[in-house]
Amino acid sequence: MYAQSPGVSFSQRAIRLTLALLVLTSAGAAHADTWRATYSVSLLGLPIGTANTVGEFSHNAYRIDANAKLSGLGTMVSNAKGAVSATGAIVAGNVAPATYAVTAAGATLTRTMRMSLAGRAVTGVDISPPFEDKPDRIPLRDQDKRGVVDPVGAFVIAVAGSEPLVGPAACNRTIPVFDGYTRFDMRLAYVGQRKVTAAGYSGPVAVCAVRYVPIAGHRPDRPGTKFMAENKNIEVWLAPVESARVLLPYRVSVRTMIGTTVIEASQFSIEASK
């Protein structure tokens, strides 16, 4: 869900997008359940990559690790691959990220970003190598790093109280996201429900429409930024995890400037602790 950053190749943006949208949750607390998922990534209906996630989650904490790589037709563009790791807590029905790290590697460049947060405020960011700054980039302010979640925390959808997990409460929200370089909102709106079947899960998912709203750190005149800000063809399907009262992405569909990218689970399972 990133706008184009300077110096980032298409293949690296594809990996970053895949990892950011895969953001599935887990945690290292007592009585943790183990969550595993495998995703296929397609562009224009053609397979271009795969992604795997594994982690643990509970009512009050999460940890996730995911990796993605281009394959099949995707290797005709690049041999890009990436990995992401994140930790945090769920407090009073709200996600409170603690750490976020992502590495994206292409044929000529590997970039690593690490970020720490406390109380939904960014306490540190390290990007190596750093992005080249551009004069047309909207400057980041201190307030752009407060009251935010990282791209992984953005897709850990917690539902407080007794609201049904698969219903409007899953979607009707605005999520403030800081990815270490840009600040944007994700505005979710409830569309309805669907029934899905994959290895490990068969049941309902909440369908949410998503709008990307750039706030700071982006380059407003870039075609990719304008396209995403006007994009009305972004959708996420969220599967429930009743024990933790969270929902996780089952399927993500994003129209891009070169066609629609779909990330969909072929395996999605929760193993309860014993």
Walk through the language-model features, giving the residues of each:
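Acidic, serine/threonine-rich low-complexity disordered tracts
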Residues: 31-119, 164-274
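Cleavable N-terminal signal peptides
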Residues: 18-20, 30
